[in-house]
Amino acid sequence: MAITKKKLVVYTFTLLFIISYVHCQSTSASSPGFDNGEVCKQFKFNPCERGGDRGCTVFCTRKLFTRGECRDEGCWCCPSFDIGESCQGFKFNPCERGGDRGCTVFCKRKLVTRGECRDEGCWCCPGQV
């Protein structure tokens, strides 16, 4: 039984599809130590070793998060939300080029479910899309 080109191509693409699907599945959970249930992100680089909470906050601000906090596991970057409206505006404004879709993509990278363009710029809001 010979392996034809067609079977080899199908097998290769199937294998690549399965590997990319398994590799790209992201999981998020509430990080320890944050009491309002917001989703935070930990990076491999740990600015807490040299800069403490201030270094962590500066690092997180450069990553377009609003705050950072040093925990036992390292530096955690979090979007903090206003209690009244539960949305947060960011300095970077993807609305100028991408509109609402660009803002939503930007917010999802910040682990927030939706984004909307307002006069002030891109606002990331938790909740249903």
From Swiss-Prot:
GO biological process assignments: defense response to fungus; killing of cells of another organism
Disulfide bridges in this chain: 40-78, 48-70, 56-75, 60-77, 87-125, 95-117, 103-122, 107-124
Signal peptide residues on this chain, from the entry's feature table: 1-24
Entry keyword set: Antimicrobial, Disulfide bond, Fungicide, Plant defense, Secreted, Signal
UniProt superkingdom: Eukaryota
GO CC terms, sorted: extracellular region
Subcellular location: Secreted
Family statement: Belongs to the DEFL family.
Name used for this protein in its record: Defensin-like protein 200
Organism for this UniProt entry: Arabidopsis thaliana
